[in-house]
UniProtKB/Swiss-Prot annotation:
Chain sites annotated for binding [4Fe-4S] cluster 2: 74, 104, 107, 110
Topology term for the membrane: Peripheral membrane protein
Compartments, as annotated in UniProt: Cellular thylakoid membrane
Pfam families: Fer4_7
Protein species of origin: Prochlorococcus marinus (strain MIT 9313)
HAMAP family linked to this entry: NDH1_NuoI
Signal sequence, renumbered to the chain: none
Protein name per its UniProtKB record: NAD(P)H-quinone oxidoreductase subunit I
Cofactor binding description: Binds 2 [4Fe-4S] clusters per subunit.
Gene name for this UniProt entry: ndhI
């Protein structure tokens, strides 16, 4: 008798635990059903990199002293420093500097230990290329000023979602009381067409005024 009652109690406890676990799982599922998908519609939407983002390395040729500290602190000895010794000045003369971003792990050691601060990390992360050899940047390519997402009018920049409090920004739109940092392609084309129409209208009015002034008075 007691054995049968114990089995009934154990079965009831197991059923209650199973129902509790099922309810917890369904609660998580229903919670996600109420949320909109957080999908960045690249390339029409782009994330704005967070503070101290380690993107493409910027290099200043005039500041480099060819000390090769960046090569020694690099985990894979990646930077290539081409220099010759000037016998007259007894100093190194830098000829070329290159970094292969197809191999770089963007650890930032070269930037941190550079004695002249000729290296810096930028927020540029769009480095995709059809040929992996084109990822080997020389001193000219490294010296190019970085591009910023916020200065591109054809995209809608979105701030890093982890740094925003809940409810500040809809994943697919911005709040009504906040202006967009950029424009979608359709909006950019519309604004450009309006600007062209206004310019043409101003030119027509100026020509009409000039013709009226040229006509002799009766």
């Amino acid at each position: 008798m007691f054995g049968f009652l114990k089995k009934v109690v154990d079965y009831t406890r197991d059923a209650a635990d199973a129902a509790n676990y099922l309810i917890q799982g369904l609660a998580v599922t229903f919670d996600h059903l109420r949320r909109r998908p957080i999908t960045v519609q690249y390339p029409y939407e782009k994330l704005i990199p967070s503070e101290r983002y380690r993107g493409r390395i910027h290099y200043e040729f005039d500041k480099c002293i060819a000390c090769e500290v960046c090569v020694r602190v690099c985990p894979i000895n990646l930077p290539v420093v081409d220099w010759v010794m000037n016998k007259e000045t007894k100093k190194k003369e830098l000829r070329n500097y290159s970094i292969d971003f197809g191999v770089c792990i963007f650890c930032g050691n070269c930037v941190e230990y550079c004695p002249t601060n000729c290296l810096s990390m930028t927020e540029e992360y769009e480095l995709a290329a059809y040929d992996r050899h084109s990822l080997n940047y020389d001193n000219v390519a490294l010296g190019r000023l970085p591009t910023s997402v916020t200065t591109d009018p054809s995209v809608q920049p979105l701030r890093e979602l982890a740094y925003l409090p809940k409810g500040v920004m809809d994943p697919h739109d911005v709040p009504a009381n906040q202006p967009r940092a950029g424009q979608l392609p359709a909006e950019a084309l519309k604004s450009l067409s309006l600007q062209q129409e206004s310019v043409q209208g101003d030119e027509g009015e100026s020509l009409q005024d000039a013709s009226d002034q040229d006509q002799p008075s009766g």
